[in-house]
Amino acid sequence: MTAHRPEPLTEPLIPMPALTPEALRAAVEKLTPSRVPAFVQDLVEATTSTQQNQSLAPLRTFVHTWGVFVAIQRRPPLAARLRHLEEVVGAGTEDPTEAMAEIRAIHAAAEAEAGL
């Protein structure tokens, strides 16, 4: 496997939404409707934890996680590449070093794109 630099691969399907739960939910609904239940569950858990701990850290983590997810999912070929790399690492049949490096690069590019 050759390490690849993450590239946009295609124009995004939708613009990058604001990093708010409402905007991220709308993006998840458009891009990956099957993930809406997980999004809602994560939001409920983050909100509950924020209230219980009187800390915004859980909500920040939620926005970061789903902001990166949306940034990647906006480009289906990039999302497919990430899934492939995760499968390579999960299979354990190859040295995962290059795949892990590319996964990190994809996530770093998505964080930058999302403004995180």
Map each language-model feature to its residues:
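Generic alpha-helical secondary structure signal
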Residues: 22, 34-37, 57-60, 76, ...
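A generic structural micro-environment signature
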Residues: 7, 34-37, 65, 76, ...
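Charge-rich, solvent-exposed alpha-helical interaction surfaces
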Residues: 27, 42, 46, 62, ...
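Short interaction-prone segments
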Residues: 13, 62, 70-72, 76-87
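Amphipathic alpha-helical interaction modules
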Residues: 34-74
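Amphipathic alpha-helical binding modules
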Residues: 79-116
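Short terminal alpha-helical segments
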Residues: 2-45
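Intrinsic-disorder/low-complexity, polar/charged segments
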Residues: 20-24, 75, 91, 111-112
